[in-house]
């Protein structure tokens, strides 16, 4: 047993460096350091069955290249462009907001009980004003059910107002609005409702995206416009319909808000009008703005192998091959004109790099793979081989042939000279034989090189496949170059990304003991938090800083047990399942398992996962930018002020609040209280329904007109009754006898005393008659008594006696 202080610890190192054999550049050092730090982050890796599925291609065979024609050259690969066309758009719309406010008896009783919001497109003549002066009219007209309704901001008059910028959350979206506050002032009369109107003009400058085949586009706020951004070029702009109309302005002016006086820009612009908004964008040339293909990779030295029906292209930099038909693409320069500038520039740069050893052998050729990728193939030929061919086609017996002539001229002259004698024919045959042997030797070398590359890749795939059976996680991590999680699903592997936890929240426990004295943890327990989370989770420290979401790694406790666990740049030393000390990782020697080959002229072929599209391209491939959409919408919705009360508060100011308060008072009465509450609630609901029905009847146009007529008739009737009452009080005799004044000339009035005697006698006579009627009414039995007596008499067989005499 070696003492602890002399214990030699060796940690396995999977370094891929080659020592002093291959110098490492600064870029490679930075890249290696980035990967190293990524490996030493605390992370949680799950083995979800919903991850990406992969399998190893074990059926790949290396094609037989015997007696095949091999050519070397420069290969450019272009892939389908999945990134949408991104361009600037400007959206215009007017928004009318109508709110209904209830003015309660107190200041706290003011509440908004309802809200309506409508948006409409802006007409073209007003868009011109908005783009030139950033002004608009604060009114709008909306046709609803065949009726044209006019809305004015603040319930006022039509005015020209200024648009001002609004702070946004993202720099890609800029808003200009005319009214930032919602008009929600209550009426002056208590207990009444009032409807307030707000009209807001809005301009939004943002980006839009359109994917191939460019038949529609989506704005950054989520608006979808079913118009091609290049509809002016391909004449696909739709005609005016009920849903969408398009206008093209050949000389439209759009000014910058900060430089409104000097930033005049007159450009061709397209306008699309929908029901809710209008949107415009600058008309551009489609061929100069978008391209269906995009550059992927270039290979300085590639090999083209000719088979019976296809061409095979391979290169040392990639573990994949390309297969195409022999027929090159027709009309490539016209169909893919957008690629020609990049192709010519790239080929010139590649040719310049090998200008000392190779020269172009013909023009560039264009092929298309079965997967839709475009291959640009520029054949190359070694300078020595070209010189040998030129010498072979040049006659040595023709002194007049200039050395600076072209190859075609020398070939023609050599043919003429060869026909002069058999000596030249023998000489030319010798040169041709030497050239054929040289070409065959070069082809054999290229053939062996191609087969070697292919076999090496097949063997590496088989090795990875067998290792994956032992530890798939390590295999996929090595292939991806970053920590991933895997799960074997039969013959395929499910790969998911690991989730980095909050690095500062990870706490490694100092004890490996459990509540059971005989059971101990085989890996240190840890507690941690996820990013943007406050909840603590428990787990165990796994290999290479992975956190396992379980505490099931246990073992029987052993006496004098000693373990070492590495986390980030530190090693934790446990003795008897208790933490003793923390050592730096650098203090522990490494066991380097990499065997360096000190041959600088041999290139290393690494197994790499071919990534056709980067993560950035896949992210941009979606025309919906959901992150920007939701962030901007939430920020804009929260920044609008003016709504001082919510709808929950409005429920406390209506008639139901009385029932709620009444039920709270009678809650302690038990079932009796429930009965009282139900009766009161039914009564209030009944009267509430009656009142609601009356109000709805009044709201109806016919009912409202009838109500106004009824109110007018009642007012007229009241006026007539008041006048009649006044006349009765002023001249009662004249009201009873209208013709009394006409008899003044023929009738002599009586003395006042006599008239008073007559009136007093009439009053006494009326009172005596009234008293007799009251006495008779009092002596008469009540209705209930009469009904009871009638029932009893009929029951005993009695009948009512007739009060009239019968005439016989």
Curated annotation (Swiss-Prot):
Q: Which residues are glycosylated?
A: 30, 158, 239, 251, 285, 331, 344, 355, 361, 532, 569, 587, 598
Q: Where is this site: Cleavage?
A: 410-411
Modified after translation how? A proteolytic cleavage by host furin generates two subunits that remain linked by disulfide bonds.
First and last residue of the signal peptide:
1-19
- Family listed: Belongs to the herpesviridae glycoprotein B family.
The protein's name: Envelope glycoprotein B
Q: Which gene encodes it?
A: gB
Q: Which source organism does the UniProt entry give?
A: Saimiriine herpesvirus 2 (strain 11) (SaHV-2)
Membrane topology, as annotated, equals: Single-pass type I membrane protein
Q: Which residues lie on this side of the membrane: Virion surface?
A: 20-701
Entry GO CC = host cell endosome membrane; host cell Golgi membrane; host cell plasma membrane; membrane; viral envelope; virion membrane
TM region(s), chain numbering: 702-722
């Amino acid at each position: 047993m070696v003492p602890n202080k002399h214990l030699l610890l060796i940690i396995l190192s999977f370094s891929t460096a080659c020592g002093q054999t291959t110098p490492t550049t600064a870029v490679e050092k930075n890249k290696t350091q980035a990967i190293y730090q990524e490996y030493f982050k605390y992370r949680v890796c799950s083995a979800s069955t919903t991850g990406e599925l992969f399998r190893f291609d074990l059926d790949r065979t290396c094609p037989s290249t015997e007696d095949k024609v091999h050519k070397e050259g420069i290969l450019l690969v272009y892939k389908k462009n999945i990134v949408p066309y991104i361009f600037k758009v400007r959206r215009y719309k007017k928004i009318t907001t109508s709110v209904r406010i209830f003015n309660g008896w107190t200041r706290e009783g003011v509440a908004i009980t309802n809200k309506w919001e409508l948006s409409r497109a802006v007409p073209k003549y007003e868009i011109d004003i908005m783009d030139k002066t950033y002004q608009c009219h604060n009114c709008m007209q909306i046709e609803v059910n065949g009726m044209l309704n006019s809305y004015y901001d603040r319930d006022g008059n039509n005015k020209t107002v200024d648009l001002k910028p609004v702070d946004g959350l993202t720099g890609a979206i800029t808003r200009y609005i005319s009214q930032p506050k919602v008009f929600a002032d209550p009426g002056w009369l208590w207990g009444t409702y009032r409807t307030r109107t707000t009209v807001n003009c809005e301009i939004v400058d943002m980006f839009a995206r359109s994917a191939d085949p460019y038949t529609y586009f989506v704005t950054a706020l989520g608006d979808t416009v079913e118009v091609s951004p290049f509809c002016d070029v391909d004449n696909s702009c739709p005609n005016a319909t009920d849903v969408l109309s398009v206008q093209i302005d050949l000389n439209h002016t759009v000014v910058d808000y900060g430089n409104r006086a000097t930033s005049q820009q007159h450009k061709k612009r397209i306008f699309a009008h929908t029901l809710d908004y209008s949107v415009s964008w600058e008309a551009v040339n489609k061929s100069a703005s978008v391209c269906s293909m995009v550059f992927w990779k270039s290979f300085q030295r590639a090999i083209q192998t000719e088979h019976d029906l296809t061409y095979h292209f391979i290169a040392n930099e990639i573990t994949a091959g390309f297969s195409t038909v022999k027929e090159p693409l027709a009309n490539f320069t016209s169909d893919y004109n957008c690629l020609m500038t990049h192709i010519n520039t790239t080929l010139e740069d590649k040719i310049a790099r090998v200008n000392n050893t190779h020269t172009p052998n013909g023009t560039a050729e264009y092929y298309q793979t079965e997967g839709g990728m475009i291959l640009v193939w520029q054949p190359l030929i070694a300078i020595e081989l070209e010189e040998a061919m030129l010498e072979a086609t040049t006659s040595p017996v023709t002194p007049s042939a200039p050395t600076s002539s072209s190859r075609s001229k020398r070939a023609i002259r050599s043919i003429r000279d060869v026909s002069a004698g058999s000596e030249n024919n023998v000489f030319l045959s010798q040169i041709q034989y030497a050239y054929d042997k040289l070409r065959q030797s070069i082809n054999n070398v290229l053939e062996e090189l191609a087969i070697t590359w292919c076999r090496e890749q097949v063997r590496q795939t088989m090795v990875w496949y067998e290792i994956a059976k032992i530890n798939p996680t390590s295999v996929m991590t090595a292939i991806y170059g970053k920590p991933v999680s895997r799960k074997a699903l039969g013959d395929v592997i499910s790969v998911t990304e690991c989730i980095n936890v909050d690095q500062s929240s990870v706490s490694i426990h100092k004890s490996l003991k459990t509540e059971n004295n005989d059971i101990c943890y085989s890996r240190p327990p840890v507690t941690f938090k996820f990013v943007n989370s406050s909840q603590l989770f428990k787990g165990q420290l796994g290999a290479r800083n992975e956190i396992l979401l379980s505490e099931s790694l246990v073992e029987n406790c052993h006496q004098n047990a000693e373990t070492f666990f590495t986390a980030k740049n530190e090693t934790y030393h446990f003795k008897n399942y208790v933490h003793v000390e923390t050592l730096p990782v650098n203090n522990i020697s490494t066991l380097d398992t990499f065997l360096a080959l000190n041959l600088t002229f041999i290139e290393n072929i690494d197994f790499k996962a071919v990534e056709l599209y980067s993560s950035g391209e896949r992210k941009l491939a979606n025309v919906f930018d959901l992150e920007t959409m939701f962030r901007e919408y939430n920020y804009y919705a929260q920044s609008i002020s003016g709504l001082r009360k919510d709808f929950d508060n409005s429920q406390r100011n209506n008639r139901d609040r009385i029932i709620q308060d009444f039920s709270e008072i009678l809650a302690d009465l038990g079932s009796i209280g429930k009965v009282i509450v139900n009766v009161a609630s039914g009564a209030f609901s009944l009267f509430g329904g009656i009142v609601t029905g009356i109000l709805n009847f009044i709201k109806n146009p016919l009912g409202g007109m009838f109500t106004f007529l009824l109110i007018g008739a009642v007012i007229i009737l009241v006026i007539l009754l008041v006048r009649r009452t006044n006349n009765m009080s002023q001249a009662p005799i004249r009201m009873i006898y209208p013709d009394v004044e006409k008899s003044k000339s023929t009738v002599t009035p009586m003395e006042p005393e006599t008239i008073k005697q007559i009136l007093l006698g009439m009053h006494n006579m009326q009172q005596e008659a009234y008293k007799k009627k009251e006495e008779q009414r009092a002596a008469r039995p009540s209705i209930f008594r009469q009904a009871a007596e009638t029932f009893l008499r009929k029951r005993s067989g009695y009948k009512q006696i007739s009060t009239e005499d019968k005439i016989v």
